[in-house]
A protein has these predicted regions:
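C-terminal helical "lid" of AAA+/P-loop NTPase domains
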Residues: 1-4, 16
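Soluble catalytic regions of large protease machineries
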Residues: 27-29, 37-43, 49-215
Length: 215
């Protein structure tokens, strides 16, 4: 980027641009999205940004955009973890990271709650979807949900940050007879996995509810 712009030195902006290109993709040269989609993307990224700024002790927000790119992203929030927490993540850092990851979904819910309450409709479909909430939420947060579940599973099963104790599920890939006997065989292992799954679900729900309340 510095050579392309005829610069004599590499600037911080050049580094950020190169990092974006590698991790996120090239910006799209065509904008054919409707205003409603752009508004949704703006809310989504604002959710991530607001929470990342709230947890400024852990994160530095580098760039926020609602411009689409060729990698398929409608927009993105680029932030980095401060050096201290890159090498030694704390329990609080992981929880903050989890909340930030779900900020986009929480912001979408807030947007459509406001949208639905402000626009009357002559069509009542409540009987069709009577037991389903947040019907206008999009699939745009799918990558965020994957990230959140990954963080939550590490929190519970790898780092021992939950009530189940200092159990590392990764050790299950290296079985030995003494451990199998101590854990009660396959039945105990299955029970432990169920406990981990429940704890992960609880943690993700906690993070989402916290993100929603803040936004």
């Amino acid at each position: 980027y510095s050579v392309r712009n005829n610069l004599t030195e590499i600037t911080y902006s050049n580094i950020v641009d190169a990092y974006e290109k590698i991790t996120i993709g090239l910006p799209s040269s065509v904008e054919n999205r409707g205003d409603d989609v752009i508004e949704l993307v703006a809310y989504h990224e604002a959710g991530h940004t607001l929470l990342a700024l709230l947890f400024s002790e852990f994160f530095d927000v580098k760039r926020v955009t609602i411009n689409a790119n060729k990698g398929g992203a409608g927009g993105y929030t680029l932030f980095t973890t401060k050096e201290k927490y890159q090498s030694l993540p704390t329990k609080k850092y992981l929880l903050a990271n989890l909340i930030v990851a779900l900020g986009g979904r929480a912001a979408e819910v807030v947007l459509y709650e406001n949208y639905q309450s402000s626009i009357p409709s002559n069509y009542d479909n409540s009987e069709v979807f009577y037991n389903i909430t947040d019907l206008d939420i999009t699939t745009g947060a799918s990558a965020d949900l994957q990230q959140a579940n990954s963080i939550a599973r590490q929190y519970v099963a790898q780092f021992g940050f939950d009530m189940i104790g200092l159990y590392d599920s990764s050790s299950s890939s290296k079985p030995f007879l003494g451990r199998d006997m101590a854990m009660g065989g396959d039945k105990m292992s299955d029970d432990t996995k169920k406990i981990i799954d429940c704890k992960v679900t609880e943690l993700v729900e906690y993070a989402y509810n916290t993100a929603y309340e803040i936004i």
